[in-house]
């Protein structure tokens, strides 16, 4: 129910003191309202109950196990929130001069240093405000590199069939023609097809390693050799960096540029449309094209590096320095863990994924890549169960809600039919994983005995199974009641 539908005429909350110097005459006439705003009329208690009730209906990492594949829904430590909200950071104006921002700039400089070491790259820019924007920046840098060499005919970007949807989108936005490369039955890039595909038009290839199939690209060195010998560059999508922290670096694999998803690997908040951060790191070929500003260090201290110091930069992607609050949270997360802690992140995220994968296989679920070890996530395909019982991946996802678990990613990657992409992350305990396994075992029994129970799930949520066709064709998304209902609050 919308809050407007609870409104009753003349119902009020507590009165608030009027500002001492408030005078409507001080406000320009064109900015004054001529009609009263359409606001609901409720008591303070009703408002508190309404929004508290809504908050309890959310699934989140703070309330439920959230094994959303390719999203790395790990716990965000509250210490990072507290420290990033210290007055010296929180109240700093974005245009404050560098001499008055030395502590802030030091944090960003040290974050740059740590991230370049983690990735094996030469330099990094922190200004991109989301992973997708960082990805766009990296592809734009590849384009700038080729154009600086007069290679205007390099117009093709190779993208695997298991790639994130943002990969071909970023390539297309930068003017490249996208060429799809297939993967083998074991999840590796098809090297023979890659050799046939590269040529004088090849600008580069975009890869995630481990891939979205949940397996490590075992022939990455050969892939890098093929692309570089053809005159192209390698772009690394940092979506799955969590699996290899402290173990293997993208720069050491041969990648030339990459972006990092701070909301995944480095425990900054997910969702809500932002704020986000997607730093871009580059090797020797591309570092001069990084977006500005960056933070530099000189004998006086720390300062901004802008277009003046970086004339080959692709330019600015954000106002000021990007989303500083998110960057500070990632910095604090890294300082809390240290090198050994980061290495344990990779170990436990991989351990949890493989434990969960093997247990589900033992129950009777079909693995998409049974001969491969999982990295940080894995895929089960429900195609045999769909054929036998008519139950789909969507049905299982809905039923998991009744057992108190957020559903894994479903129907992605697209090349695996009826799939669940499951990523438990390193912050989950064995007890939590065992509870999830128990739920999946019960669901498997339900599939074989009472499949209709799944087809109509969920049964214990505020909103049950929607008519998705009707919802898509007759979208009803609004913040206030319509027609007759509106009379409740505009009388």
Curated annotation (Swiss-Prot):
Gene Ontology cellular component annotations, sorted alphabetically: cytosol; glycine cleavage complex
Cofactor dependency: pyridoxal 5'-phosphate
EC numbers, comma separated: 1.4.4.2
Highest taxon in the source lineage: Bacteria
The keyword Oxidoreductase belongs to this UniProt entry's keyword annotation: yes
Enzyme class: oxidoreductase
InterPro entries xref list: GcvPB, GDC-P_C, GDC-P_N, GDC_P, PyrdxlP-dep_Trfase, PyrdxlP-dep_Trfase_major, PyrdxlP-dep_Trfase_small
Entry-annotated residues carrying N6-(pyridoxal phosphate)lysine: 264
CDD domains according to UniProt: GDC-P (cd00613)
Catalytic activity reported: N(6)-[(R)-lipoyl]-L-lysyl-[glycine-cleavage complex H protein] + glycine + H(+) = N(6)-[(R)-S(8)-aminomethyldihydrolipoyl]-L-lysyl-[glycine-cleavage complex H protein] + CO2
Family: Belongs to the GcvP family. C-terminal subunit subfamily.
Protein name per Swiss-Prot or TrEMBL: Probable glycine dehydrogenase (decarboxylating) subunit 2
Provenance organism: Coxiella burnetii (strain CbuK_Q154)
